[in-house]
Curated annotation (Swiss-Prot):
Cross-referenced Pfam families: AAA_lid_4, RuvB_C, RuvB_N
UniProt name for this protein: Holliday junction branch migration complex subunit RuvB
Gene this protein is translated from: ruvB
Positions contributing to DNA binding: R294, R313, R318
Region (Small ATPAse domain (RuvB-S)) residue spans: 185-255
Native organism: Pectobacterium carotovorum subsp. carotovorum (strain PC1)
Chain sites annotated for binding ATP: R24, G65, K68, T69, T70, E131, D132, Y133, R174, Y184, R221
Positions of region (Head domain (RuvB-H)): 258-336
């Protein structure tokens, strides 16, 4: 199973990029959720503008789909500068990074997505660029090779990652601002869904937006994807506004339940409950029971279920919690 194939995957899908970009907030006063991040960034940006400085380098981390790229764009807009965008895997050679850095204007933003995937060679070039706004370049080869230093304009590097722990300490320490994005609450997601509906020209009732929001796994990207699928359903199966009833029918048809679980989530939980009496069960046995690789369970299925309190990891294996039993209308006693 590929994570991107799931409707409730938080990973970006290229075909959605254009629509997602159109629905993104452009400024901090349009940014919903993450109140602590918003408050801090407002102060940091105002202070940098007041001094006439580039904003300190910024690291944004957190689960996928929470708006790291959106926040980077907002920072550039608020600072009134351009933003160049790239990603860690794309920067294969030091020259790739040098080409980007030497084309920056003063105070511009360089945004590197998946910054934890930078190669060591590229990362070494980044250190003096971040710290001293200087670029060390090797000219020539062999004994005739020499290093020259190029001065760079003051700029802001914004790095985004889902795996902050994978960053090397020297790189992490060079970020003056570090922000973690958290999962969104239902109220904030409902507002985001309502705003996206306006962008799409949809007649969405508060009950309809609530139904989409509560099944979106705390993630704006998933909320917007579900909204588009509900729109498809309403255009074919109903007329008029997207009400709570219409949204419920659409999401039930798509097999996304009230917790935001899909078929694979439920299959995993029911395997633990039905086949292994609620656990504990070892990962290899569980993988065999549902016909998936153990890596798929560990990296794709488990994290959200654990975070929501439906599965517990123990030294003896995985166990279903009371939340899992209640979700299916069961109790431990039902299993004998």
């Amino acid at each position: 199973m590929i994570e991107a194939d799931r409707l409730i995957s938080a990973d970006a899908i290229p075909e959605e990029e254009f629509l997602d970009r159109a629905m993104r907030p452009k400024l901090l006063n349009e940014y919903v959720g993450q109140p602590q991040v918003r408050e801090q960034m407002e102060i940091f940006i105002q202070a940098a503008r007041k001094r006439g400085d580039a904003l300190d380098h910024l690291l944004i981390f957190g689960p996928p789909g929470l708006g790291k790229t959106t926040l980077a764009n907002i920072v550039a807009n608020e600072m009134g500068v351009n933003m160049r965008t790239t990603s860690g895997p794309v920067l294969e050679k030091a020259g790739d990074l040098a080409a980007l850095l030497t084309n920056l204007e003063p105070h511009d933003v360089l945004f590197i997505d998946e910054i934890h995937r930078l190669s060591p060679v590229v990362e070494e070039v980044l250190y003096p660029a971040m710290e001293d706004y200087q670029l060390d370049i090797m000219i020539g080869e062999g004994p005739a090779a020499r290093s020259i230093k190029l001065d760079l304009p003051p700029f802001t590097l914004i790095g985004a990652t889902t795996r902050a722990g994978s960053l090397t300490s020297p790189l992490r320490d060079r970020f003056g601002i570090v922000q973690r994005l958290e999962f969104y609450n239902v109220a904030d997601l409902q507002y985001i869904v309502g705003r996206s509906a306006q962008c799409l020209g949809l007649d969405l009732t508060p009950e309809g937006s609530l139904e989409v929001a509560r099944r979106a796994r705390g993630t704006p990207r998933i909320a917007n994807r579900l909204l588009r699928r509900v729109r498809d359903f309403s255009e074919v199966k109903s007329e008029g506004a997207i009400t709570g009833v219409v949204a419920t029918q659409a999401l039930d048809m798509l097999a996304v339940d009230t917790e935001g679980f899909d078929y694979m989530d439920r299959k995993l939980l029911l395997a633990i409950i039905d086949k292994f009496m609620g656990g504990p069960v070892g990962l290899d046995n569980l993988a065999a029971a549902i016909g998936e690789e153990r890596e798929t369970i560990e990296d794709v299925l488990e994290p959200f279920l654990i975070q929501q309190g439906f599965i517990q990891r123990t030294p003896r294996g995985r166990m279903a919690t009371q939340h899992a039993y209640r979700h299916f209308g069961l109790t431990r006693e039902d299993l004998g």
